[in-house]
Amino acid sequence: MDQPAPAPEPMLLDAQPPAAVACDKKQQEGEAPYAEGNDAVTGHIISTTIGGKNGEPKRTISYMAERVVGTGSFGIVFQAKCLETGETVAIKKVLQDRRYKNRELQLMRAMDHPNVISLKHCFFSTTSRDELFLNLVMEYVPETLYRVLKHYSNANHRMPLIYVKLYMYQLFRGLAYIHTVPGVCHRDVKPQNVLVDPLTHQVKLCDFGSAKTLVPGEPNISYICSRYYRAPELIFGATEYTTSIDIWSAGCVLAELLLGQPLFPGESAVDQLVEIIKVLGTPTREEIRCMNPNYTEFRFPQIKAHPWHKVFHKRMPPEAIDLASRLLQYSPSLRCTALDACAHPFFDELREPNARLPNGRPFPPLFNFKHELANSSQELISRLIPEHVRRQATHNFFNTGS
């Protein structure tokens, strides 16, 4: 089983959260209010106050906790219904140390992208034991990539390639956004943290409990990320890693969707490295230096790389194999970026003018890029946004008189 990632490094809390200050996406600097109806479990009603800033009226909003949908060392996630609107939401309830800011909350407030889970608002609650909990109210997405893959595996089927392309493309798009705009490294990319809407097939990256803004030269903990998806530099104990650890994890997810099972199913940290070496071969001294300079004198058994085309079944498209090989490189700097992955020929089918879901419905939005393209070359942008989409955008621009 995957090992749980440790609690992220704390952030100092500037002050205790006052009871009457609202916390929604428009109030970036506000603290969260407190809620009535504590110890929330299934069937309980939680009421809190939102608004009250920038001329907005305060209003009470109540949630009925319906069922627990996730548990972990962090706390619980439960599905809830807003009694005022009938909207279904997900509420992540985490124990809050009063001395520190919650990093997940700070990061989620800064993010806004179609392929990243969105924060609606948040509030604090307390228990009879005077424990303080932070409740993050998020949009509800019913499925995870893990459960979707399990559905196919249980039926002894492989996931259809069109869905592999659709889900992975959107995952890379979400990663491209968090890596470039807020500059965040997720640090726990895995199928369980990729949400899927079964009707629209829109994908959203979730669970930013391990995420962090990486600062060059500033050390980070290496014991991060669930084991099967852990980049080799983390296994080597590197502390000055980059967002390329997410790219490795995404490569592992791609391989898992193609194979129907994890590519590197290590039973321990050391065994994880053995599983990687069995496929990629023994890393060279230069590759080891790129991962962690302290290990260059360490002697590894010499094992030849297993050819990628033999890792996957014979009918696997060469574009899929090529993309996996570009993601799963020992040297972090040699892994392609998330945007480069989006532009890879493996995803060309998604860019065809008449491409649709197998049921005939349109794809979810795939080309509504945000600020992540700001520093991209014109050549990359032209590969990312197909001509028919650019033509339509130009047509709409002139027709609206903008």
Swiss-Prot record:
Look up the EC number in the record and give it: 2.7.11.1
Membrane as a keyword?
no
Q: Which UniProt keywords apply?
A: ATP-binding, Cytoplasm, Kinase, Nucleotide-binding, Nucleus, Phosphoprotein, Serine/threonine-protein kinase, Transferase
Provide a GO biological process annotation: cell differentiation
Keyword Cell membrane belongs to the record: no
May I have one GO cellular component term? nucleus
Do you know which PROSITE patterns this protein is assigned to?
A: PROTEIN_KINASE_ATP (PS00107), PROTEIN_KINASE_DOM (PS50011), PROTEIN_KINASE_ST (PS00108)
Region listing for Disordered, in residue ranges: 1-38
Q: Domain of life, per the record?
A: Eukaryota
Gene3D superfamilies listed in its UniProt record = Phosphorylase Kinase, domain 1 (3.30.200.20), Transferase(Phosphotransferase) domain 1 (1.10.510.10)
Q: Which reaction does it catalyse?
A: L-seryl-[protein] + ATP = O-phospho-L-seryl-[protein] + ADP + H(+); L-threonyl-[protein] + ATP = O-phospho-L-threonyl-[protein] + ADP + H(+)
Which Pfam families does the record match to this protein? Pkinase
Q: Where in the cell is it found?
A: Cytoplasm; Nucleus
The enzyme's first-digit EC class, named in words, is: transferase
Please outline how this chain is modified post-translation: Autophosphorylated.
How would you summarize the oligomeric state and partners of this protein?
Answer: Interacts with DLT. Interacts with OFP8. Interacts with GRF4. Interacts with PUB24. Interacts with SMOS1.
What is the protein's known function?
Answer: Serine-threonine kinase that acts as a negative regulator of brassinosteroid (BR) signaling. Phosphorylates DLT and BZR1, two positive regulators that mediates several BR responses. Phosphorylation of DLT and BZR1 inhibits their activities in BR signaling. Phosphorylates OFP8, a positive regulator of BR responses. Phosphorylated OFP8 shuttles from the nucleus to the cytoplasm where it is degraded by the proteasome. Phosphorylates the E3 ubiquitin-protein ligase PUB24, a negative regulator of BR signaling, which targets BZR1 and promotes its degradation via the 26S proteasome.
In its miscellaneous comment, the UniProt entry states:
Plants over-expressing GSK2 display typical brassinosteroid (BR) loss-of-function phenotypes, and plants silencing GSK2 have enhanced BR signaling phenotypes.
Family per similarity comment: Belongs to the protein kinase superfamily. CMGC Ser/Thr protein kinase family. GSK-3 subfamily.
Q: What is this protein called?
A: Shaggy-related protein kinase GSK2
Q: Which gene encodes it?
A: GSK2
